[in-house]
C-alpha cells in the first residue's frame, strides 16, 4: 500500500480558526486538490479512510473540522458552515500543494448538504461527490433523531462539538439549525451544481437517510450526474464489503474526472 504524508494546516472563516490536515501523496506536487466535508459530528479522524485512499490515488486532500467541532473555533450553524466551506475552497486553491486547473469536493451526510448549498453560488469547484447526503435540511433538522443524537453526544463525548454542555447554547444550536435550513436547503439548490459533474453514492441499508429522498435529490440535479446505490451499505459503512465498494467507487470516479 502506498504511503501518504499529512501536514497540519489552519485557516480563518469569519474570524474563527478552522484546523485540519492536508493528506498528500508522496513525491513532488502540485497535485489535483479535493476538499473533504464531514457530517455531524463526523469522525475525530478525518485523515484515514477516503482521504488517505484519495491521496494514494494522487490527490491532495484538505480535511478540516467545521466551526464548533473538535479542534476548530466557534459554534455550529449551517450558515456558518457554508462560509467555512467557501473558506476551505479558498485555502485549497491558494495552496502551493495543489494545481490551479482543477479541484473537487468529497462530502458526506450533513457535509453533503453544506457542499450543495455552498457550491450553488461558488463555481470554483470542478467535480462534486456526495455520500449518503442529507437531501433536505429542513426535514432533517426537525427529526427527533437530531435532538436525541445531540443529547447522546453531550453525555458521552461533549468535546466533539462545542457548546453542548451549556443548556442555552444547546437549545439555540438546535433552533438555529431549523432557522438556517429554511434558507439553505440542498433540495432547492442541487440543480445549480450542473454543468459540473456530480456523483451521489448511497446505501440500501441507510435507515437514517432514506434512499427515496436521495433519489429525489438526484432527479433534481442537472447533467452530468451519476447515482450509485451500494447494496448492504448503511450510513456509517459498517459492513467491510460495502465500505470497500463505496470508497473504491469514489476514488475511481475522481480519477476519471481528473483524467477524463
Task: Annotate the PLM regions.
Residues 1-29:
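N-terminal cap/lid segment of alpha/beta-hydrolase-fold proteins
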Residues 8, 18, 122-216, 223-224, ...:
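The alpha/beta-hydrolase serine catalytic core
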Residues 31, 36-42, 204:
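Active-site glycine-rich loops that stabilize anionic/oxyanionic intermediates
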Residues 39-52, 66:
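The serine-hydrolase catalytic nucleophile loop
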Residues 41, 65-70, 135, 234:
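Alpha/beta-hydrolase active-site loop signature
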Residues 41, 69-101:
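Catalytic nucleophile-loop/oxyanion-hole region of alpha/beta-hydrolase
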Residues 51-73:
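Conserved alpha/beta-hydrolase
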Residues 106-117:
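Glycine-rich nucleophile elbow surrounding the catalytic serine of serine-hydrolase chemistry
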Amino acid at each position: 500500500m502506498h504511503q501518504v504524508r499529512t501536514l497540519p494546516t489552519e485557516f480563518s472563516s469569519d474570524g474563527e480558526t478552522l484546523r485540519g490536515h492536508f493528506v498528500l501523496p508522496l513525491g513532488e506536487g502540485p497535485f489535483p486538490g479535493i476538499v473533504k466535508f464531514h457530517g455531524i459530528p463526523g469522525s475525530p479522524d478525518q485523515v484515514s479512510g477516503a482521504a488517505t485512499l484519495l491521496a494514494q490515488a494522487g490527490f491532495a486532500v484538505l480535511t478540516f473540522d467545521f466551526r464548533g467541532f473538535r479542534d476548530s473555533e466557534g459554534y455550529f450553524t449551517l450558515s456558518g458552515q457554508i462560509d467555512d466551506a467557501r473558506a476551505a475552497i479558498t485555502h485549497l486553491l491558494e495552496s502551493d500543494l495543489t494545481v490551479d486547473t482543477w479541484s473537487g469536493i468529497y462530502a458526506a451526510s450533513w457535509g453533503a448538504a453544506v457542499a450543495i448549498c455552498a457550491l450553488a453560488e461558488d463555481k470554483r469547484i470542478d467535480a462534486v461527490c456526495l455520500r449518503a447526503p442529507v437531501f433536505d435540511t429542513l426535514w432533517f433538522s426537525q427529526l427527533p433523531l437530531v435532538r436525541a443524537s445531540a443529547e447522546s453526544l453531550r453525555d458521552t463525548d461533549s468535546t466533539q462539538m462545542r457548546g453542548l454542555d451549556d443548556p442555552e447554547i444547546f437549545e439555540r444550536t438546535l433552533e438555529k439549525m431549523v432557522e438556517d435550513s429554511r434558507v439553505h436547503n440542498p433540495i432547492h439548490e442541487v440543480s445549480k451544481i450542473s454543468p459540473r459533474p456530480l456523483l451521489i453514492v448511497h446505501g440500501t441499508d441507510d435507515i437514517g437517510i432514506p434512499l427515496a429522498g436521495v433519489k429525489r435529490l438526484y432527479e433534481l440535479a442537472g447533467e452530468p450526474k451519476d447515482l450509485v446505490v451500494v447494496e448492504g451499505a448503511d450510513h456509517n459503512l459498517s459492513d467491510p464489503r460495502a465500505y470497500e465498494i463505496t470508497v473504491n467507487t469514489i476514488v475511481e470516479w475522481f480519477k476519471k474526472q481528473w483524467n477524463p
